Swiss-Prot record:
Organism: Arabidopsis thaliana
Cytoplasmic side: 1-37, 99-123, 179-195, 257-291, 354-469, 579-671
Topology class, membrane: Multi-pass membrane protein
Regions that span the bilayer: 38-58, 78-98, 124-144, 158-178, 196-216, 236-256, 292-312, 333-353, 470-490, 558-578
Pfam families to which the protein is assigned, alphabetical: HCO3_cotransp (PF00955)
Keyword Transferase annotated: no
UniProt name for this protein: Probable boron transporter 6
Compartmental location: Membrane
Entry's family note: Belongs to the anion exchanger (TC 2.A.31.3) family.
InterPro entries hit by this protein: HCO3_transpt-like_TM_dom, HCO3_transpt_euk
Coiled-coil regions listed in the entry: none
């Protein structure tokens, strides 16, 4: 993130507006020109966004006594998404109601019902004042260029925050599952044993449905790497497997014998959008004047915490959506997007809706889906042009020149300096490689070498974000369908979100490392492993991990304190000072830079090749179909990213490439 020219107020916002103004028109033209193919990433990100929002709505309804529900979370996600798609700086960023918002709104509800002069009646009105303060603070942060501060949040903060959210997801799943054995909604005219059996049956069915959803969702999430099935089928299951599993287990819930009451299993509580319970929040602004002045001023305190939380969460999501490995050509807009977030928060507060902000992993998932789309389009045109030139027996320089012209034509923004030459450097070397007699192994093959050497390109546009936000809004018309989902299926979905977010979190990987006996540590080196395993002594890894664990327990413990829990975001800002001043005194700077690196770097035990490339290199006469080509793009990018959407940077183990025993690189210490 650059800071040049941002010394004065408004400088960052003005620079962002100027940068995005130049490409705003093209953002729409590129999306429209993509045609019907834009529906694939649109549907993909729609399901990835809508399911968590429905789950958060159920959680919010449970913790706020029904004051807010899935209707409000869906409405907020849709309205904020449409505003951001049209007016936002970075259109690849996906916004939605997230878990931190649910946590803070739960604390605010607990505070309100404990105060007779506010109570449940003025809960949304007081929260609206909290949103007003939050909005003011976010706008001030953007005006004074606070966006540059986000670079001071290192991996340690992001992974602690991610682990906290994962544990809170798991906690919610466990609490929800236990509540199924005490469901008050399940009533029977008979008492005693019959009533107990119905409650018990509901609980057992909840265990089956939640575990079933959890296991099948985790399995389908990895479908792209399955050995079985056609590429298009594996790709479809990998992209849409989770919503399909929700549909499957919902359908299975209707196979319960008719002798059991209709209230078993328990299903989602969600008022219809046109019912009074859902209509009240649209007019909450008229009740804001009823809030006592003392509480209006007191709303500043949670406003500070929520502003800090949104600033951190929104900026990190934006960073992940535009990682350098995606090779985005359009400029970022961190300051302006924080300013717009302040406006969105104000609108949501006045409408009685929980605000939306940038979400993970949906934001980088959106970018990745558009990278697959654009890579398919570019490769097909380049392969076609190369084959045409080869039929005409054109020279190698002419073949490369024609392919370069296609690449420039398909670029999402005008090329700058020597960017195209740099991006196509490896492909040029392959094309211009001299033939060695009758050896055909080094001969240029468009089907093989273009795929292997084509850089990642993203279709940077606004249409997919706008369409998926509109679809989320249309989901409100399907509330009667949403109410058919068993609540236990959502508890399984919460557990899925928790477990699926752990791979790629180095804090989690180091925690697992603590349970491996020193005599078995060599097993870690036999597979893909994080770079710190070979570069940092084992005792340093243990010490650093224990520090993170203690700090994590402190953050998690604070969420259990009824009133003080609202201050848990302050611990993440305190971590900036700890990282800059305390940790360098406790750890060697080289070790600290590896353990707290900005990139997710992995080391493989031996040189690897992508299976599709190796298959073709063996000279097989079986060519992959068009559908298979498209799938391999998706599989490659899927393997390149962690569960939170972070790009993996893989390097070859020095020990494998240079097996001479003159230097020991593995630094595990048994004691």
């Amino acid at each position: 993130m650059k800071s040049e020219g941002e010394s004065g107020p408004f400088q960052g916002i003005l620079r962002d507006i100027e940068g995005r103004r130049k490409c705003y028109k093209q953002d729409w033209i590129r999306g429209i020109k993509t045609g019907i193919r834009i529906l694939a990433p649109t549907c993909y990100i729609f399901f990835a966004s809508s399911l968590p929002v429905v789950a958060f709505g159920e959680q919010l309804s449970k913790h706020t006594g029904g004051a807010l529900s899935a209707v409000e979370t869906l409405a907020s996600t849709s309205i904020c998404g449409i505003i951001h798609a049209i007016f936002g700086g970075q259109p690849l960023l996906i916004v939605g109601v997230a878990e931190p918002t649910i946590i803070m709104y739960t604390y605010l509800y607990s505070f309100c019902i404990s105060r007779p002069d506010i109570g449940r009646e003025l809960y949304l009105a007081w929260v609206a004042w909290v949103c007003v303060w939050t909005s003011v603070l976010l706008i001030l942060l953007s005006i004074f260029n606070a966006g540059t501060i986000i670079t001071r949040f290192t991996r340690i903060a992001g992974e602690l925050f991610g682990m906290l959210i994962a544990v809170l997801f798991l906690q919610e799943a466990i609490k929800g599952l236990i509540s199924e054995f005490h469901a008050p909604e399940i009533k029977n005219q008979e008492t005693g044993k019959s009533h107990f059996l119905l409650i018990y049956a509901n609980g057992l069915l909840a265990v089956i449905f939640s575990l079933g959803l959890l296991i099948t969702a985790l399995k389908s999430r990895r479908a792209k790497s399955w050995k079985y099935g056609f590429g298009w089928l594996r790709s479809f299951i990998g992209d849409y497997g989770v919503p399909l599993m929700v549909l499957l287990w919902t359908a299975l819930s209707y196979t319960v014998p008719s002798e059991v009451l209709p209230s078993v299993p328990r299903r989602l509580f969600c008022p219809l959008p046109w019912e009074p319970a859902s209509l009240y929040h649209w007019t909450v602004v008229k009740d804001m004047g009823k809030v006592p002045i003392m509480y209006i001023l007191a709303a500043f305190i949670p406003g500070v915490m929520i502003a800090g939380l949104y600033f951190f969460d929104h900026s990190v999501a934006s960073q992940m959506a535009q990682q350098k490995e995606f090779n985005l050509k359009n400029p970022s807009a961190y300051h302006y997007d924080i300013f717009l977030l302040g406006i969105i928060t104000l609108i949501c507060g006045l409408l009685g809706l929980p605000p939306s902000n940038g979400v993970l992993p949906q934001a980088p998932m959106h970018t990745k889906s558009l990278a697959v789309l654009n890579r398919q389009l570019i490769r097909k045109k380049m392969v076609k042009k190369a084959k045409e030139c080869m039929k005409m027996k054109a020279s190698k320089s002419e073949i490369y020149g024609r392919m370069q012209s296609v690449f420039i034509e398909m670029e999402t923004s005008p090329p700058q300096d020597n960017s195209v030459a740099t991006d196509l450097k490896e492909l040029k070397e392959v094309v211009m490689r001299p033939d060695e007699g009758g050896d055909t192994k080094g001969k240029f093959d468009p089907d093989v070498h273009i795929e292997a050497n084509l850089p990642v390109r993203v279709n940077e546009q606004r249409v997919s974000n706008l369409l998926q936000s509109v679809l989320v809004g249309l989901t409100l018309l399907a509330v009667t369908v949403i109410k058919m989902i068993p609540s236990s299926v959502l508890w399984g979905y919460f557990a899925y979100m928790a477990i699926d977010s752990l791979p790629g979190n180095q804090f989690w990987e180091r925690l697992l490392l603590l349970f491996i006996p020193p005599s078995r540590l060599f097993k870690v080196l036999e597979g893909v492993h994080a770079s710190f395993v070979e570069l940092v002594p084992y005792r340093v890894i243990v010490t650093f991990t224990l520090f993170q664990l203690v700090y994590f327990l402190l953050c998690y413990g604070m969420t259990w304190i009824p009133m003080a829990g609202i201050f848990f975001p302050a611990l993440f800002f305190l971590l900036i000072s700890i990282r800059e001043h305390l940790l360098p005194k406790l750890f060697d700077m080289q070790h600290l830079q590896v353990l707290d690196a900005s990139d997710y770097e992995e080391i493989v035990a031996a040189p690897i090749q992508h299976s599709s490339f190796a298959y073709r290199k063996l000279g097989s006469s079986h060519h992959l179909s068009e559908g298979e080509d498209e799938f391999y793009d998706a599989e490659i990018l899927d393997e390149m990213t962690t569960s939170r959407g972070e790009i993996r940077i893989r390097t070859i183990s020095f020990k494998e490439v240079h097996p001479e025993p003159e230097e020991k690189h593995v630094t595990f210490e048994p004691h």
